[in-house]
């Protein structure tokens, strides 16, 4: 076998993109991502994540756009159009009312019809009607009773009948508890697929519990997606997307998305000497983990390097103190080395605690 490293662009976080309030920026980011997916030999990207930011403790808020349904739907639509302009499938998720990670596999979202229509569905409705995504991912949670993946009113009555969407549904990984109910509700593809699901669907089809016309419709939508893909069409991918052009997009959109909430005369800094406190000044958190994980890129600029590049002098004694502290924390947390990929966030270093004497000595 041949091993190859891939270096895709680290595009801006979704909430940064939404902070631009710019449809064209969303299109450019989506277009860049769609291009890289295509040129690296893939057909489908499982994004954008469009759940509303309703709780600041939600562990995947960095993947979402906003607490505003209109802004989320509009930016999401621009992103989807951009991705699919490159012939790559987008997959808006997690549909719907999947707004927390705590107990996410079994959480019951009890939502009134008015709140559902005006808040939780609205972002998806705008996105569907303005961009026509090829696929949509259903969520883990239950919605007013049944699991979202098994909710006929949600998947068929609202989205297909009312909104007129004709694309393919895919479940979140191992969502729901009844494969046949998911098929009957209108969910087309179950991921990642289990033997017990195959058997349940076959038995239900043979017994008549799962009508063939329903199964045929599910399969038809999957095939309609497949025949649009790069690989089905025999596209010869290059492994060389235009990373320089995409880096320019990141620079422009990242700058446009910066929001200064409060200044109080502190910025710009008057002096040129700075002292950095806090572990993440030296060991930054680049993003989420698990399903929403990001890897630290090979081409990064640390906070210290960035400050020095623009002429600031970073206080050296603190660098040494935090370097030693982080090394000790690494040994404490991972005595046998860091574990491989996990769906749970890695343990983080405890903050360095300074006594008054240590603090005075550090800043003298």
List PLM regions with ranges.
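Glycoside hydrolase catalytic-domain context in secreted enzymes
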Residues: 1-364
